[in-house]
Amino acid sequence: MPNDEHLAVLRGGAAAWNAWCAENRGTADLAQAGLRGLDLRGYDLSRADLRGADLRGTNFSGANLSGARLEGANVFKAVFDDADLTGAFLYGAQFLNCAQLGATRNWQSAFRDGDLACGASIPDRPN
């Protein structure tokens, strides 16, 4: 279950969220959150726990998702244009495809399943 405080700050807009993240360097707990269709352009979601979240149609354009955990999240029709996926965990992300990955930055370093090789080597799964 997601942290209610984290959800409230997230819904307050990118400026409020990014300021909160700068002060609270821990992991944002948004696991299993219902974030369907939200506009999260430019949000700093680095290291956020989005495992199992409903992210259908969510706009992550320009967002920082480095080190974020998206395992098992539903990203059907989510937009990732110019999002940073450095070291993101994408194992089991539902409906993720190579076209979505190709629109991002640093996707080659994201930890992902073999069906998302998309012409690049897959980093070894971390312990």
Segments predicted by a language model, with ranges:
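Tandem repeat scaffolds
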Residues: E5-A8, G12-N127
